[in-house]
Amino acid sequence: MVADVLLTHFNQLFCLNDPGHPLTGQEMKKATIVEDGYIAIKDGLIVALGSGEPDAELVGPQTIMRSYKGKIATPGIIDCHTHLVYGGSREHEFAKKLAGVSYLDILAQGGGILSTVRATRSASFDNLYQKSKRLLDYMLLHGVTTVEAKSGYGLDWETEKRQLDVVAALEKDHPIDLVSTFMAAHAIPEEYKGNPKAYLDVIIKDMLPVVKEKNLAEFCDIFCEKNVFTADESRYLLSKAKEMGFKLRIHADEIASIGGVDVAAELSAVSAEHLMMITNDGIAKLIGAGVIGNLLPATTFSLMEDTYAPARKMIDAGMAITLSTDSNPGSCPTANMQFVMQLGCFMLRLTPIEVLNAVTINAAYSVNRQERVGSLTVGKEADIAIFDAPNIDYPFYFFATNLIHQVYKKGQLTVDRGRIL
C-alpha cells in the first residue's frame, strides 16, 4: 500500500496496545515507546507504524515525506470535560476568590454559574460561536484534537438549545471533533429557586425528548453538589435520561461527598467528574461499576484549594482515570491541556506515561470515540500531536510552555509551528 503521507524519524512515538477497555491499574503505567519511529497515513487513517526506515512499498511518487528528528509524536490529545460555550467572563470574581470567598458563597450571592447564565442568555448565536471558536483554536494549537462540550449556562430551553446548536455548528466547521453533552442541570435557575424538582421535571418532560429527537447531545450530565442538586435529584434526572438512550456523566464529590459517586455506580455512568472529595468506599464503587474517573486538577488549582483528587490512590486501586481542563469562565478559566497534563505530574504525582494514557486512550473511552481515536494504532484516524521535545518526559519537565510543533487531524497537517493552516 502506498501512503499519502509518511512521517519519519521521530525520536519517539508514544504507542500502546489498546486492550479493548479503558486502562486501569498497572495498565496505566505501560506504553510502547518506539524509537526512530515512523507513521504512514492514507485516506486520513494510520496504515503503518514502525521503527527505522519505512517499507519501500509505502512510498510512491505522490507520497509526502516529512522527517521529525528531535521530535516526538503522541495521539491527538482529548479534552473530555469542558464548558465550552458561554457568554461573558468572570474576572470580577477573582478578587473575591483571592480574599477567600468560597465558590459556593459566590454562587449564593448570585455570582458564579448564575452570573454566566445571565450573560449567556443575552448572547447571540454568533457571539457564542465566535467566542467558542477562539477557545477551540487555542486548544488545537496546544495539541487537542477532540473535545467534549457541555451546555448548562442557559438553564432555559432557548439558551440551552442555542449552546447545543453552537456545538453542532463548530463540529461541522472546526478541525477539532466535538462531543456534545446536555447539562441543563448545571445549577438551579433563579426562577426555580427552592424548587429544584420542578425544574428537573421541565428538563425531563420538555427538554430531553427534543435533545434526543434532534440528536443534539450524546451525553447527559448533572451537578450533584451541596446547595445544587442532591443525590436523589441526580438519580431522578439521570435515570430518566438513561431510559431515553443518553450516556451518562455526573459532576460528583467536588466540594462535598453527598452521594454522587453512588449514583454514578448505580446507573453505570460512563464517567464521574471532579472527585476531589471521594472516599475509599467511593473509589471501590466506581471500580466495581467500571466508571471512569475524570479528574480536573486545574480546577483545584484555580480555586486555590489544597485537596486534589487522589489520583495515585485511584490508579493503584485499579481505577481508570482521565484528565481534562474543565474549561469554564469561573472555577477554571483555562483551555490549556498541556498545563493540565503537567499538573497531573506535579500535583497528582502521576508519571508522564500515566498522564498520556489518561488524556489519550482513556479519554477516548470517556467520550465514546475509542474506535476512531485515542491511540497511534493502524486503522484509527491519524490524529497526531507532534511535540518539539527529545522524549516523552520532556513536555512535563519543561512546563508552562507550548511545545507543540505540529498537529495532524485525520491525516491533514492542521497546525504548523503556532499557526492553524
Swiss-Prot record:
Pathway: Amino-acid degradation; L-histidine degradation into L-glutamate; N-formimidoyl-L-glutamate from L-histidine: step 3/3
InterPro entries referenced in this protein's UniProt entry, alphabetically: Amidohydro-rel, HutI, Metal-dep_hydrolase_composite, Metal_Hydrolase
Binding site for Fe(3+): H81, H83, H251, D326
Cofactor binding notes: Binds 1 zinc or iron ion per subunit.
UniProt keyword Cell division, yes or no: no
GO terms of biological process kind: L-histidine catabolic process to glutamate and formamide; L-histidine catabolic process to glutamate and formate
Entry-linked SUPFAM superfamilies: Composite domain of metallo-dependent hydrolases, Metallo-dependent hydrolases
Residues annotated as binding Zn(2+): H81, H83, H251, D326
Similarity comment: family membership: Belongs to the metallo-dependent hydrolases superfamily. HutI family.
Record-given protein name: Imidazolonepropionase
Native source organism of the sequence: Streptococcus pyogenes serotype M5 (strain Manfredo)
Phylogenetic placement of the source organism: Bacteria, Bacillati, Bacillota, Bacilli, Lactobacillales
Gene name linked to the record: hutI
